[in-house]
Amino acid sequence: MRAVVQRALGARVEVGGQVVGAIERGLVAFVGAAKDDDDADADHVASKIAGLRVFSDDAGKMSRALADVRGGGVLAISQFTLFGDVRRGLRPSFDGAMEPVRAEALYDRFVAALRARGLTVATGRFRADMRVFVENDGPVTILIDSKRTF
């Protein structure tokens, strides 16, 4: 499972012009599943995001996790395009992405794992054409992958 995580002052996601998920200060996580991912991958990425220390303490050091931020939440957006492969040619191949039915179940597992860690989670709509609005903070952007390091 792969995630692009951005620290945000606020974010929302719309489907068909209607807001379906929103957070104030927190993290936006764009998340995709690989063909061979399983529950352990979803739990691993959720654990990393829950413990990610990217919020500043009183001294200005990034040492606080989301649980330490008053009113903080996660906006989780499913995004299979994180597995777009352009090593050959210019059109991305998505062969590495999990098929949609299994991916939706794993995405739901990921969201449940975040909530089980006490986080407030808003979501987009799986397989929908979404508009995502993020007010980046920093910016701080972190890449997480359950199978490899960046």
From Swiss-Prot:
The keyword Metal-binding does not apply. It catalyses: glycyl-tRNA(Ala) + H2O = tRNA(Ala) + glycine + H(+); a D-aminoacyl-tRNA + H2O = a tRNA + a D-alpha-amino acid + H(+). Its EC number is 3.1.1.96. It is found in: Cytoplasm. GO terms for biological process: D-amino acid catabolic process. Keywords: Cytoplasm, Hydrolase, RNA-binding, tRNA-binding. Transmembrane segments: none annotated. The keyword RNA-binding applies. A motif (Gly-cisPro motif, important for rejection of L-amino acids) lies at residues 138-139. Pfam families: Tyr_Deacylase. One of its GO terms (molecular function) is D-tyrosyl-tRNA(Tyr) deacylase activity. PANTHER family: D-AMINOACYL-TRNA DEACYLASE 1, D-TYROSYL-TRNA TYR DEACYLASE. NCBIfam families: D-aminoacyl-tRNA deacylase (TIGR00256). Homodimer. A Gly-cisPro motif from one monomer fits into the active site of the other monomer to allow specific chiral rejection of L-amino acids. Belongs to the DTD family. An aminoacyl-tRNA editing enzyme that deacylates mischarged D-aminoacyl-tRNAs. Also deacylates mischarged glycyl-tRNA(Ala), protecting cells against glycine mischarging by AlaRS. Acts via tRNA-based rather than protein-based catalysis; rejects L-amino acids rather than detecting D-amino acids in the active site. By recycling D-aminoacyl-tRNA to D-amino acids and free tRNA molecules, this enzyme counteracts the toxicity associated with the formation of D-aminoacyl-tRNA entities in vivo and helps enforce protein L-homochirality. HAMAP family: Deacylase_Dtd. This is D-aminoacyl-tRNA deacylase. It comes from Sorangium cellulosum (strain So ce56). The gene is dtd.
